[in-house]
Amino acid sequence: MDQTLKHKIFSFIKKPLTIAVLLFVFTLIEIYWAMGSFSDKISSGCLDCSFFDDAYLMTLFSTVFLSIVFLALSFIKSSTLKVILQLLILISVWFFWNYIIFVDRESAWSTYLFKEEIMYTFKFSFLPISILSIVTVFTLNYISRKL
């Protein structure tokens, strides 16, 4: 392969790959920070599965989904609208996974109402999601401008 073709291929995959790696790292950190207190509890869906297995699979699914969505959102010209949409989508996805972990590892073994599940998930997730979503979105936008 000649150098120009290698350079074109690398420049084509550099942005999506960077977005995917950052989303993977920040999502894994968020799941462990928010729901790490449930890592010693048994999963109701898979008695042999570790917390890491669940977190890793959720992170992989999130990385693929969010990478596609964030690449699509990168075509939006209004940076304010783009950042707001990225934050809302990221917060929604992370809260959803945190809720799934809470239900799987805590409330499935007890008698929580839906409202209580949401409130406890919010309690555990608020600080990690608030901090990491802002850091993630601004880091991604900063790096995307540089690429």
Annotate each PLM feature.
Residues 67-97:
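Loop-to-transmembrane helix junctions at the membrane interface
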Residues 12-19, 108-147:
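Alpha-helical membrane-associated segments of multi-pass integral membrane proteins
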Residues 22-32, 88-101:
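Aromatic-anchored segments of alpha-helical transmembrane domains
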Residues 2-54, 59-61:
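N-terminal signal-anchor transmembrane alpha-helix
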Residues 35-60, 96-126:
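Interfacial non-cytosolic loop connecting adjacent transmembrane helices
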Residues 33-38, 42, 76-81, 104-105, ...:
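Membrane-interfacial segments
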Residues 61-76, 136-141:
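Alpha-helical transmembrane segments in multipass membrane proteins, preferentially the mid-helix core
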Residues 60-65, 127-131:
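Membrane-embedded alpha-helical segments of multi-pass membrane proteins
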